[in-house]
Amino acid sequence: MRTLWIMAVLLVGVEGHLWQFREMIKEATGKEPLTTYLFYACYCGWGGRGEPKDATDRCCFVHDCCYGKLTACSPKLDIYSYSQKNEDIVCGGGTECEKQICECDKAAAICFLDNLGTYNKEYNNYSKSRCIEESPKC
Protein backbone atom coordinates (compact mmCIF):
# COMPACT_ATOMS: atom_id res chain seq x y z
CA MET A 1 0.00 0.00 0.00
CA ARG A 2 2.91 2.31 0.76
CA THR A 3 4.23 1.76 -2.78
CA LEU A 4 0.88 2.83 -4.25
CA TRP A 5 0.90 5.97 -2.13
CA ILE A 6 4.43 6.83 -3.26
CA MET A 7 3.48 6.24 -6.92
CA ALA A 8 0.40 8.43 -6.54
CA VAL A 9 2.48 11.26 -5.07
CA LEU A 10 5.10 10.95 -7.83
CA LEU A 11 2.49 10.93 -10.58
CA VAL A 12 0.54 13.96 -9.38
CA GLY A 13 2.88 16.18 -11.41
CA VAL A 14 3.09 13.89 -14.43
CA GLU A 15 1.74 15.45 -17.58
CA GLY A 16 1.86 14.43 -21.17
CA HIS A 17 2.85 11.17 -22.69
CA LEU A 18 3.16 8.74 -19.75
CA TRP A 19 -0.18 9.89 -18.41
CA GLN A 20 -1.66 9.53 -21.92
CA PHE A 21 -0.33 5.97 -22.13
CA ARG A 22 -1.93 5.22 -18.76
CA GLU A 23 -5.27 6.57 -19.98
CA MET A 24 -5.03 4.62 -23.24
CA ILE A 25 -4.43 1.34 -21.38
CA LYS A 26 -7.23 2.09 -18.93
CA GLU A 27 -9.68 2.86 -21.75
CA ALA A 28 -8.71 -0.27 -23.68
CA THR A 29 -8.63 -2.79 -20.82
CA GLY A 30 -10.73 -1.28 -18.05
CA LYS A 31 -7.77 -1.94 -15.71
CA GLU A 32 -5.81 0.61 -13.69
CA PRO A 33 -2.30 0.44 -15.23
CA LEU A 34 -0.50 1.72 -12.13
CA THR A 35 -1.62 -1.28 -10.09
CA THR A 36 -1.99 -3.81 -12.89
CA TYR A 37 1.03 -3.36 -15.17
CA LEU A 38 3.59 -1.01 -13.58
CA PHE A 39 5.49 -3.72 -11.69
CA TYR A 40 4.43 -6.75 -13.72
CA ALA A 41 6.95 -9.52 -14.50
CA CYS A 42 10.25 -8.71 -16.25
CA TYR A 43 9.40 -5.96 -18.77
CA CYS A 44 6.44 -3.93 -17.54
CA GLY A 45 7.47 -0.68 -15.90
CA TRP A 46 10.92 0.87 -16.12
CA GLY A 47 13.69 -1.27 -17.49
CA GLY A 48 13.49 -4.87 -18.48
CA ARG A 49 15.64 -7.93 -18.80
CA GLY A 50 15.43 -11.68 -19.09
CA GLU A 51 12.84 -13.73 -20.93
CA PRO A 52 9.27 -12.35 -20.92
CA LYS A 53 7.25 -14.46 -18.48
CA ASP A 54 3.98 -14.63 -20.43
CA ALA A 55 2.03 -12.94 -23.22
CA THR A 56 1.25 -9.91 -21.06
CA ASP A 57 4.93 -9.43 -20.25
CA ARG A 58 5.71 -9.88 -23.95
CA CYS A 59 3.42 -6.90 -24.66
CA CYS A 60 5.76 -4.82 -22.49
CA PHE A 61 8.85 -6.29 -24.16
CA VAL A 62 7.51 -5.42 -27.63
CA HIS A 63 6.59 -1.93 -26.38
CA ASP A 64 10.17 -1.44 -25.12
CA CYS A 65 11.46 -2.57 -28.53
CA CYS A 66 9.09 -0.17 -30.29
CA TYR A 67 10.39 2.74 -28.20
CA GLY A 68 13.95 1.58 -28.83
CA LYS A 69 13.47 2.06 -32.58
CA LEU A 70 12.47 5.70 -32.08
CA THR A 71 16.03 6.96 -31.63
CA ALA A 72 15.25 10.50 -32.83
CA CYS A 73 12.25 10.84 -30.50
CA SER A 74 11.61 11.18 -26.77
CA PRO A 75 8.96 8.48 -26.26
CA LYS A 76 8.52 9.05 -22.53
CA LEU A 77 8.19 12.82 -22.86
CA ASP A 78 6.60 13.77 -26.20
CA ILE A 79 2.89 14.53 -26.01
CA TYR A 80 0.69 13.14 -28.77
CA SER A 81 -2.98 13.24 -29.61
CA TYR A 82 -5.35 10.30 -29.93
CA SER A 83 -9.03 9.59 -29.66
CA GLN A 84 -11.22 6.61 -29.15
CA LYS A 85 -13.88 5.91 -31.80
CA ASN A 86 -16.16 2.89 -31.48
CA GLU A 87 -13.67 1.26 -29.10
CA ASP A 88 -10.84 1.83 -31.61
CA ILE A 89 -7.82 3.91 -30.65
CA VAL A 90 -7.05 6.47 -33.36
CA CYS A 91 -3.70 8.27 -33.29
CA GLY A 92 -4.04 11.92 -34.31
CA GLY A 93 -1.83 14.36 -36.13
CA GLY A 94 1.33 15.96 -34.87
CA THR A 95 4.95 15.32 -35.66
CA GLU A 96 6.21 12.04 -37.04
CA CYS A 97 7.66 11.23 -33.60
CA GLU A 98 4.32 11.88 -31.90
CA LYS A 99 2.53 9.62 -34.37
CA GLN A 100 5.07 6.81 -33.93
CA ILE A 101 4.99 7.04 -30.13
CA CYS A 102 1.21 6.91 -30.22
CA GLU A 103 1.31 3.83 -32.46
CA CYS A 104 3.72 2.08 -30.03
CA ASP A 105 1.38 2.84 -27.13
CA LYS A 106 -1.69 1.84 -29.12
CA ALA A 107 -0.13 -1.53 -30.00
CA ALA A 108 0.71 -2.13 -26.32
CA ALA A 109 -2.79 -1.20 -25.12
CA ILE A 110 -4.37 -3.54 -27.69
CA CYS A 111 -1.89 -6.26 -26.76
CA PHE A 112 -2.87 -5.93 -23.07
CA LEU A 113 -6.53 -6.19 -24.05
CA ASP A 114 -5.94 -9.22 -26.27
CA ASN A 115 -4.00 -10.95 -23.49
CA LEU A 116 -6.11 -10.20 -20.42
CA GLY A 117 -6.63 -13.95 -20.08
CA THR A 118 -2.89 -14.56 -19.64
CA TYR A 119 -2.50 -12.06 -16.81
CA ASN A 120 -0.99 -13.89 -13.85
CA LYS A 121 -1.32 -12.18 -10.46
CA GLU A 122 1.83 -14.00 -9.33
CA TYR A 123 3.82 -11.73 -11.66
CA ASN A 124 2.42 -8.51 -10.17
CA ASN A 125 5.16 -6.85 -8.07
CA TYR A 126 7.59 -9.41 -9.47
CA SER A 127 11.21 -8.81 -8.50
CA LYS A 128 13.29 -7.92 -11.56
CA SER A 129 16.20 -9.69 -9.84
CA ARG A 130 14.45 -12.94 -10.79
CA CYS A 131 14.69 -12.04 -14.50
CA ILE A 132 18.07 -13.61 -15.11
CA GLU A 133 17.71 -15.31 -18.49
CA GLU A 134 19.27 -13.82 -21.59
CA SER A 135 17.02 -11.17 -23.10
CA PRO A 136 15.58 -11.93 -26.53
CA LYS A 137 16.43 -9.66 -29.44
CA CYS A 138 13.82 -7.17 -30.56
Swiss-Prot record:
Active site: H63, D105
A single GO cellular-component term on record: extracellular region
UniProt EC number: 3.1.1.4
InterPro entries named in the record: PLipase_A2, PLipase_A2_Asp_AS, PLipase_A2_dom, PLipase_A2_dom_sf, PLipase_A2_His_AS
Subcellular location: Secreted
Disulfide bridge map: C42-C131, C44-C60, C59-C111, C65-C138, C66-C104, C73-C97, C91-C102
Annotated Ca(2+) binding sites: Y43, G45, G47, D64
Cofactor dependence: Ca(2+)
Main enzyme class: hydrolase
GO annotation, biological process: arachidonate secretion; lipid catabolic process; negative regulation of T cell proliferation; phospholipid metabolic process
A molecular function (GO) term: toxin activity
Tissue: Expressed by the venom gland.
Catalytic function, reaction form: a 1,2-diacyl-sn-glycero-3-phosphocholine + H2O = a 1-acyl-sn-glycero-3-phosphocholine + a fatty acid + H(+)
Pfam families: Phospholip_A2_1 (PF00068)
Keywords noted in UniProt: Calcium, Disulfide bond, Hemostasis impairing toxin, Hydrolase, Lipid degradation, Lipid metabolism, Metal-binding, Platelet aggregation inhibiting toxin, Secreted, Signal, Toxin
Quaternary state and interactors: Monomer.
Name this polypeptide is given: Acidic phospholipase A2 jerdoxin
Originating organism: Protobothrops jerdonii
Lineage of origin: Eukaryota, Metazoa, Chordata, Craniata, Vertebrata
